[in-house]
Amino acid sequence: MTEKGEPVEYGELNILYQDEYFVAIDKPAGLLVHRSFLDKHETQFAMQMLRDQLGQHVFPVHRLDRPTSGVLLFALSSESARDMNKLFIEGTITKRYLALVRGFAPESFFLDKPLKEELDKIADKFATQNKAPQAAQTQFNCLHQATLPIPIG
């Protein structure tokens, strides 16, 4: 949504790579990967947009949060999606993010904080209540720090 509450029109997705098994797109910030009960008013989703653009079903291999832009990988068959998902679960494949942040950070630090699923009372009414936390480990490395001579606040 724009600042005026109007829906954003994303147009065609930028395809970064495509072969017979996978397609990678440049997901813009603000675009959901797929439909969600948590955002019922949204009408545009990367999965449906790419399906319409390619004229075939696509299967998300991973997700990026709505405010996150970056490379989003889709499989072109359920078998390819399953095989790639297995590699993510085994830790054979990892994701790497670059972020521009405000404030000061140490040169390097490691965060080991398992993700506990917080179920939504409506959307997850029938979901498993006692699901084990998902492993989540992140190594942070500061590539550069700068001070801008611009007052903020």
Model-derived regions: residue spans:
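RNA pseudouridine synthases
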Residues: 1-153
